[in-house]
């Protein structure tokens, strides 16, 4: 009986670990060299997007892009700004030598579909937003806010 209980706990812990890994935003650093995922002071994931090209397009590639109930902030601000879901956040260091993006493309290169179960916010300059995942996008309770400073 003791051995069976230990095995059951071990299996449970393994699946718990797998489920928790799927709730993340993971950059594909082989493609997006400067894309950074951090956290706001309250723990909400904070994405410092790539600098835009000459057309104002910030192309960001992820192995995984999932937004849980806490939400996520896409930082499109050069300066300190107040976000709705994370409070005050620092300017995006990737934008210090460029302008803010007019379009943000979030592309998923991994094999899993994206799960969007929370609020996504573009903090800083207003921008068009595209989420592309060839494996699919599951949306439940999602919202998108585009704030302009």
Regions found by a protein language model. Name each.
Residues 10-20:
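Bacterial N-terminal signal peptides
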Residues 1-9:
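Bacterial N-terminal signal peptides that target proteins for export
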């Amino acid at each position: 009986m003791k051995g069976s209980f230990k095995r059951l706990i071990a299996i449970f812990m393994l699946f718990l670990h797998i489920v928790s890994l799927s709730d993340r935003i993971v950059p594909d650093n082989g493609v997006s060299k400067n894309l950074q995922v951090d956290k706001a002071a309250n723990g909400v994931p904070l994405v410092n997007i790539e600098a835009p090209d000459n057309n104002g397009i910030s192309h960001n590639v992820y192995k995984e892009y999932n937004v849980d109930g806490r939400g996520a902030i896409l930082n499109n601000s050069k300066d300190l700004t107040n976000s709705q879901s994370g409070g005050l956040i620092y300017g995006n260091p990737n934008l210090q030598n460029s302008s803010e993006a007019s379009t943000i493309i979030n592309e998923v290169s991994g094999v899993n579909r994206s799960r969007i179960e929370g609020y996504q916010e573009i903090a800083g300059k207003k921008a068009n937003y595209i989420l592309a995942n060839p494996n699919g996008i599951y949306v439940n309770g999602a919202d998108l806010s585009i704030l302009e400073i």
